[in-house]
Amino acid sequence: MTLSFTTHWRDELPDFYTSLSPTPLDNARLIWRNAPLAQQLGVPDALFAPESGAGVWGGEALLPGMSPLAQVYSGHQFGAWAGQLGDGRGILLGEQQLADGRRYDWHLKGAGLTPYSRMGDGRAVLRSTIRESLASEAMHALGIPTTRALAMVTSDTPVYRERVEPGAMLMRVAESHVRFGHFEHFYYRREPQKVQQLADYVIRHHWPQLQDEADKYLLWFRDIVMRTAQTIASWQTVGFAHGVMNTDNMSILGLTIDYGPYGFLDDFQPDFICNHSDYQGRYSFENQPAVGLWNLQRLAQSLSPFISAEALNAALDEYQHALLTAYGQRMRDKLGLFSQQKGDNDLLDGLFALMIREKSDYTRTFRLLSHSEQLSAASPLRDEFIDRAAFDSWFAGYRARLRDEQVDDAQRQQRMQGVNPALVLRNWLAQRAIEQAEAGDMGELERLHAALADPFTDREDDYVRRPPDWGKRLEVSCSS
């Protein structure tokens, strides 16, 4: 099969990029490929063959139709205007056109210096590349909108961070890499016509159903608000903390993008901060919904030259309701509740209060709860709590609520076990795979990827056990 690549961004937005080719790594070699995604995209096996070398995956070759470029954008970082940013180490190689009309960017991360590298070296390290590959595929398996990882190479190129690490590249695939920061860039340069040009481009290619609407810009922005609310509600439901929700890391399509110092909750701590560079806790787990709105407000400001302030504010006012509605439905699913009743929030808050007090594991708590039976006062979750009396009191109220549902255990458990994962990507699991990969053993990386692709199946291995003490103390930062 021949892959088809288009150049819409290059052809339609000439002021939004710089043309350049990747800078290959020393002795680059393919260490992982996403076989299911490759099949979905029609990528021939020959491109992954050992005799092909690193090829396109290592920036050593381009496929027919590719025309590489680095995109320019700006953004707010940790609440402050950061000015021009852009693809500092990533290069958009091309836009793959599928037969069904869908189009996917092929974006090579760690591809070398670009005009937007600022003080960086244009490289990515094996550690962060593995973390992104694992996280994006884990989130996809959980049903959360995300960029995807197609292939990964390591190399003999030394990259200097807190320590010397091997350089690596990741082929990231997404329907679009347009960020809030793309619009901010030209707004702050006082070029509103280019902001509108980009809006027209995005609507034309990603919201074509809106093109003939009189108020297409407002309808488009409202959908961005809804997508952002839905995605962040999903994060909160599975206990995912992004860690660096700058406006340049916010996808216009509502995708989870730019996996850096992320983390999944171990103990349930609403104020969990996964990024040790986030000294003020701006991007803590519990702050993510509010930050999402703040970022949307920055996007709204950039769109103000052609959408009225009144209309933008009305759309922004829909965010909280959309997020709370989505979150509430997902949490009722996690509790096995098929209907909505007035006391449901109190029931959930009561469980959360217990979990905070006992430092209960977020993922294990809900997974074990999904095995509980309505008619039994015993629950596999009970042994997780020291204060059994407090748990018994909460569980009695929960069982009473289940009796109102008139749904049998099998049906309820099936729903709960389909939304409460047995396995999430804990940082200690990623770290173990990284350490073995840095030593030349890719076996654990492959095993972990395979496990994360099936997160809702009960397991007996150590992927689902409580994290070791050292695993809870792991520090991750923006260094990658």
UniProtKB/Swiss-Prot annotation:
Its cofactor is Mg(2+); Mn(2+). This is Protein nucleotidyltransferase YdiU. It comes from Klebsiella pneumoniae subsp. pneumoniae (strain ATCC 700721 / MGH 78578). InterPro entries: adnlytase_SelO, SelO. ATP binds at G86, G88, R89, K109, D121, G122, R172, R179, D258. The active site is at D248 (proton acceptor). Its EC number is 2.7.7.-, 2.7.7.108. The keyword Amino-acid biosynthesis does not apply. It catalyses: L-seryl-[protein] + ATP = 3-O-(5'-adenylyl)-L-seryl-[protein] + diphosphate; L-threonyl-[protein] + ATP = 3-O-(5'-adenylyl)-L-threonyl-[protein] + diphosphate; L-tyrosyl-[protein] + ATP = O-(5'-adenylyl)-L-tyrosyl-[protein] + diphosphate; L-histidyl-[protein] + UTP = N(tele)-(5'-uridylyl)-L-histidyl-[protein] + diphosphate. Keywords: ATP-binding, Magnesium, Manganese, Metal-binding, Nucleotide-binding, Nucleotidyltransferase, Transferase. It comes from the Bacteria. Disulfide bonds: none annotated. Mg(2+) binds at N249, D258. GO terms for molecular function: AMPylase activity; ATP binding; magnesium ion binding. Nucleotidyltransferase involved in the post-translational modification of proteins. It can catalyze the addition of adenosine monophosphate (AMP) or uridine monophosphate (UMP) to a protein, resulting in modifications known as AMPylation and UMPylation.
